[in-house]
Regions:
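Short, surface-exposed, charged amphipathic helix/loop patches that serve as local interaction elements
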Residues: 9-86
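Short acidic-hydrophobic surface loop/beta-edge motif
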Residues: 1-9
């Protein structure tokens, strides 16, 4: 586990299982036209999945208390922490 500091909160980032990491990586969907990506969907769902599975105590109340910037920052921190072992 790793301590992570947001603006006015401290959280603990958990080590996730391979299944949870795969789930989070598979949430975003890309739509192609020919060889070009024209849309990426489910980005908010993916961000929430990373936070919910990768942060200790990340229930709805906690997630709703975060600003959009904090959600983005925390989601990226969770992903980076999971990649340390790769």
């Amino acid at each position: 586990m790793k301590d992570f500091k947001l603006k006015d909160k401290s959280v603990k980032i958990k080590e996730m299982s391979v299944d949870d990491i795969d789930f989070c990586n598979d949430v975003p969907q890309m739509r192609y036209e020919g060889d070009q990506v024209v849309a990426i969907t489910n980005l908010s769902k993916a961000r929430t999945s990373w936070i919910r599975r990768g942060v200790e105590g990340a229930d709805d109340k906690f997630i709703k208390s975060l600003s959009e910037d904090e959600k983005n920052e925390l989601s990226l921190a969770v992903q980076e922490y999971q990649r340390l072992g790769e």
